[in-house]
């Protein structure tokens, strides 16, 4: 009897130990599974936060000018801009008058003659300067030549330096006309270089510069502001400082824009 009971007791003890061991293993498995799930969830959340932060950072650091130039170009868009006329005061001042048009549109109450007198870099011609460096002559003189985009950018920056409400100024020369349309589509009129009535320019050598290069001036050189376009009608709307608010054929406008070096100046926020 005693031997039988002793054997049963040993079997019972063994079963109990096995049962306890199984419970421990099962519990450990549950704990490990829970920890893995917790870490996995944390990693997913962390990755999501990191992606979101990266996207927000990229958006915050993207150049505003790049955003404007890469904007969508719908089939048509028009900005209500009133043209400022250059005559009679500034017979050759189409460039500074075009800048005046854009500044007036943005709420700056400035006069074209004020800009010409106090902000436009002017030099006499003859070889020391080019139209990329200064206005050659004076816009009050009908025999003066004019200037190109960098000079108008410089005048705009000088003016902005004295204003409490400032805008950015960019020489966007070299960009395609489609980029110019992108600016207009987002509400930004653009100063561009063209010719009077879109005449075909002819290049005349005026003098030889000190470094031996020849200075060539394009006949009919002109500057205006594009404030609208319509691809369906093949037209562009411009503020022409000689003609006022005018409509030109788009194909011809684009052709002359390229021939004049795809020059443009943008004021933007």
Task: Give each language-model segment a name.
Residues 2-4, 12-22, 26-155, 162, ...:
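Active-site-adjacent structural segments surrounding the nucleophilic cysteine of cysteine proteases
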Residues 93, 168-169, 189-194, 225, ...:
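Structural recognition of the beta-strand scaffold that forms the well-ordered cores
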Residues 204-211, 215-218, 224-269:
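Noncatalytic regulatory segments and standalone regulatory/sensor domains
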Residues 98, 173, 194-198, 228-230, ...:
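A mature extracytoplasmic/lumenal domain signature
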Residues 160-167, 211:
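Short, basic, glycine/proline-bearing loop/turn elements
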């Amino acid at each position: 009897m005693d031997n039988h009971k002793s054997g049963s007791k040993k079997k019972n003890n063994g079963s109990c130990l096995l049962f306890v061991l199984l419970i421990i293993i099962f519990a450990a498995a549950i704990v490990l599974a829970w920890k893995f799930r917790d870490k996995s969830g944390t990693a997913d959340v962390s990755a999501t936060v990191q992606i979101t932060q990266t996207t927000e950072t990229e958006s915050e650091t993207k150049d505003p000018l790049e955003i404007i130039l890469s904007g969508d170009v719908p089939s048509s868009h028009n900005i209500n801009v009133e043209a400022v006329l250059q005559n009679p005061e500034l017979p050759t001042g189409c460039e500074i008058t075009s800048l005046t048009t854009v500044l007036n549109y943005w709420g700056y109450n400035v006069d074209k003659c004020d800009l010409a007198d106090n902000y436009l870099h002017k030099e006499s011609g003859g070889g020391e300067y080019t139209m990329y460096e200064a206005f050659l002559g004076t816009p009050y003189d009908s025999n003066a030549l004019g200037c190109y985009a960098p000079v108008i950018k410089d005048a705009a920056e000088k003016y902005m330096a004295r204003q409490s409400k400032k805008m950015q100024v960019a020489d966007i020369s070299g960009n395609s006309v489609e980029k110019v349309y992108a600016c207009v589509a987002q509400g930004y009129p653009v100063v561009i270089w063209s010719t009077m009535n879109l005449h075909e320019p002819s290049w005349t050598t005026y003098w030889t510069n000190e470094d031996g290069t020849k200075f060539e001036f394009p006949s009919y050189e002109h500057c205006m502001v594009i404030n609208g376009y319509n691809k369906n009608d093949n037209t562009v709307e411009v503020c022409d400082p000689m003609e006022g608010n005018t409509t030109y054929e788009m194909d011809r406008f684009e052709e002359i824009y390229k021939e004049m070096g795809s020059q443009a100046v943008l004021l933007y926020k």
